[in-house]
UniProtKB/Swiss-Prot annotation:
This is Uncharacterized mitochondrial protein AtMg00740. Its main location: mitochondrion. It is found in: Mitochondrion. A stretch of 270 kb of the mitochondrial genome is duplicated within the centromere of chromosome 2 resulting in the duplication of the gene. The expression of the duplicated gene (At2g07686) is not demonstrated. One of its GO terms (cellular component) is mitochondrion.
Length: 100
């Protein structure tokens, strides 16, 4: 009989699933984490992290990249990677403007 640890039976929120899936996809696409964390250095990490990840997960789900990723050629992956990096830069610049 297969033993399932109690911790795996605990309910997990949709936000946690979204973050988990997003982080795995970003890792696979190859976004450098230092770029992401740099944007959160002087800010409330929790709230911004969720907001930015929501933008990304919506983009990823909208494009169905999670399901099609393995079929994409390297050039397509680069376009997606650049698009996500640009999204980070736009959000980062908006945050900087709000600080002034």
């Amino acid at each position: 009989m297969l033993h399932i640890s109690q911790e795996f039976l605990l309910p997990i929120s949709m936000e946690h699933w979204r973050l988990l899936i997003t982080s795995q996809v970003i890792k696979k696409i190859g976004i450098p984490w230092k770029v992401i964390f740099h944007a959160f250095q002087n800010h409330n990490r929790g709230i911004l992290f969720l907001q930015i990840f929501e933008h990304i997960i919506d983009f990823l789900f909208g494009e169905a990249i999670i399901y099609r990723y393995v079929l994409l050629d390297p050039k397509s992956r680069q376009v997606i990677r650049d698009s996500i990096l640009n999204s980070f830069l736009v959000l980062y610049n908006q945050i900087k403007l709000l600080e002034k």
